[in-house]
Amino acid sequence: MVMGLGLFLLVFMLGLGLTLPTLAQDNFRYRDFLAKHYDGTPEGRNDRYCESTMRRRHLTSPCKDTNTFIHGNRHHINAICGDENGNPYGGNLRISKSPFQVTTCKLHGGSPRPPCRYRATRGSRNIVVGCENGLPVHLDESIFRP
């Protein structure tokens, strides 16, 4: 009986040891996605917004060519990875059922070195995300709706 309990605890601890790094890695990828692409309450959404937000989020060394910020409720973005607000789009990609307000910042000028100058494009778009364990970890594209 004691040996059975010891074996159970050993197997449990090994399983926990294998699961925690995976969960931590997924959580890192999700947090990285949010840091690069989520801004729930933007101010301005113009060229100045792009330049300051890209700089503040450390996306300017070297200057990133293009980056899209998704605005709105984080729960609705997460829901793309399930049936509540998403449909399959191929592989591990999902397309949102509803459009999101987005700002796309595109590098203006040719140099990848700071100071980075960006042009902002605002719009409402359906977005395509890559999901892992029910969370978005990659913004694949955004699709303009007429």
Swiss-Prot record:
GO terms of biological process kind: actin filament polymerization; angiogenesis; antibacterial humoral response; antimicrobial humoral immune response mediated by antimicrobial peptide; defense response to Gram-positive bacterium; hematopoietic stem cell proliferation; innate immune response; negative regulation of apoptotic process
CDD domains in alphabetical order: RNase_A_canonical (cd06265)
Gene Ontology MF terms: actin binding; copper ion binding; DNA binding; endonuclease activity; heparin binding; protein homodimerization activity; RNA nuclease activity; signaling receptor binding
Record-annotated active site: H37, H138
EC class of the enzyme, as a word: hydrolase
Places the protein is found: Secreted; Nucleus; Nucleus, Nucleolus; Cytoplasm, Stress granule
Principal cellular location given in the protein's record: secreted
EC annotation from Swiss-Prot or TrEMBL: 3.1.27.-
Disulfide bonds: C50-C105, C63-C116, C81-C131
Residues where tRNA binds: R45, C105, I127
Pyrrolidone carboxylic acid modification, residue list: Q25
Residue window of motif Nucleolar localization signal: 55-59
Cellular component GO terms held in the UniProt record: angiogenin-PRI complex; basement membrane; cytoplasm; cytoplasmic stress granule; endocytic vesicle; extracellular space; nucleolus; nucleus
Signal peptide: 1-24
Regulation: Has weak tRNA ribonuclease activity by itself due to partial autoinhibition by its C-terminus, which folds into a short alpha-helix that partially occludes the substrate-binding site. In absence of stress, the ribonuclease activity is inhibited by RNH1 in the cytoplasm. In response to stress, dissociates from RNH1 in the cytoplasm and associates with cytoplasmic ribosomes with vacant A-sites: ribosomes directly activate the tRNA ribonuclease activity of ANG by refolding the C-terminal alpha-helix. In response to stress, the angiogenic activity of ANG is inhibited by RNH1 in the nucleus.
Tree of life domain: Eukaryota
Keyword tags: Angiogenesis, Cytoplasm, Developmental protein, Differentiation, Disulfide bond, DNA-binding, Endonuclease, Hydrolase, Nuclease, Nucleus, Protein synthesis inhibitor, Pyrrolidone carboxylic acid, Secreted, Signal, Stress response
Role this protein plays: Secreted ribonuclease that can either promote or restrict cell proliferation of target cells, depending on the context. Endocytosed in target cells via its receptor PLXNB2 and translocates to the cytoplasm or nucleus. Under stress conditions, localizes to the cytoplasm and promotes the assembly of stress granules (SGs): specifically cleaves a subset of tRNAs within anticodon loops to produce tRNA-derived stress-induced fragments (tiRNAs), resulting in translation repression and inhibition of cell proliferation. tiRNas also prevent formation of apoptosome, thereby promoting cell survival.
Subunit structure as annotated in this protein's UniProt entry: Homodimer. Interacts with RNH1; inhibiting ANG ribonuclease activity. Interacts with PCNA.
Family classification: Belongs to the pancreatic ribonuclease family.
Record's protein name: Angiogenin
Origin species: Papio hamadryas
Phylogenetic lineage: Eukaryota, Metazoa, Chordata, Craniata, Vertebrata
